[in-house]
Amino acid sequence: MKTLHLQIEGRVQGVWFRESMRREAERLGVDGWVRNRPDGSVEAVVQGTDEAVAALVAWAKMGPPLAHVERVDLSETEGEYSGFEKRSD
């Protein structure tokens, strides 16, 4: 299992990014969570097979149709997750 922390910057709030990411994560079988940050970015932790995590990271670099992703910072992290949660702001 691979676990990554993502910090996603750009026009990523108010564009259905979190809900879209939750749906994509469930489609790919990725666990973790996603939430908005006060600075206007989106933060997520994703966990799954190397292939599934890579696919979700690739999706995050594009985002949903109304988003404009400028940057995605990745770092390895630890934890155990079950399901994918859209957290409150």
From Swiss-Prot:
<dbReference type="InterPro" id="IPR001792">
    <property type="entry name" value="Acylphosphatase-like_dom"/>
</dbReference>
<feature type="domain" description="Acylphosphatase-like">
    <location>
        <begin position="3"/>
        <end position="88"/>
    </location>
</feature>
<dbReference type="Pfam" id="PF00708">
    <property type="entry name" value="Acylphosphatase"/>
</dbReference>
<dbReference type="InterPro" id="IPR017968">
    <property type="entry name" value="Acylphosphatase_CS"/>
</dbReference>
<dbReference type="InterPro" id="IPR036046">
    <property type="entry name" value="Acylphosphatase-like_dom_sf"/>
</dbReference>
<dbReference type="InterPro" id="IPR020456">
    <property type="entry name" value="Acylphosphatase"/>
</dbReference>
<feature type="active site">
    <location>
        <position position="18"/>
    </location>
</feature>
<dbReference type="GO" id="GO:0003998">
    <property type="term" value="F:acylphosphatase activity"/>
</dbReference>
<protein>
    <recommendedName>
        <fullName>Acylphosphatase</fullName>
        <ecNumber>3.6.1.7</ecNumber>
    </recommendedName>
</protein>
<feature type="active site">
    <location>
        <position position="36"/>
    </location>
</feature>
<keyword id="KW-0378">Hydrolase</keyword>
<comment type="similarity">
    <text>Belongs to the acylphosphatase family.</text>
</comment>
